[in-house]
């Protein structure tokens, strides 16, 4: 993909916003990509606030970077805590939740278009 023109966007003016309890996911389309900004409040957990049951897991892959806060991510063969500055690649079949009392913010470069999408 070649970039042929200068483009500038801000998450304060997103193309779409997906809201759910204790969180929101803002989407910006730019240069043929969809980039997402996730903001989750303390107490947020994917299986409780985005998934339809506590046993459900997120089946979207993610590639991104943590901006602030901390979040745990657990899959079939990993259990990690992500912190500011971490660059992450998370395969499908995982759960995640905010760790601590600070909001968690991350940018998503892969999987943003599918994440928390209305069915």
Residue ranges with predicted function:
Residues 75-94:
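Short acidic-glycine-tyrosine-enriched beta hairpin
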Residues 1-39, 47:
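A short, N-terminal "cap"/entry segment at the start of jelly-roll beta-barrel domains
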Residues 37-57:
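Conserved short histidine dyad/triad with adjacent acidic residue
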Residues 33, 51-53, 57-77:
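Glycine- and acidic-residue-biased ligand/ion/polar-headgroup-sensing regions
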Residues 45-46, 69-74, 96:
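Short beta-strand segments in beta-sandwich/barrel cores
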Residues 38-40, 64, 88:
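Conserved GNAT-family N-acetyltransferase fold
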Residues 38, 90, 94-95, 100-119:
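A short hydrophobic beta-strand segment most commonly corresponding to one strand
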Residues 30-33, 66, 91, 99-101:
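A short, compositionally biased micro-patch
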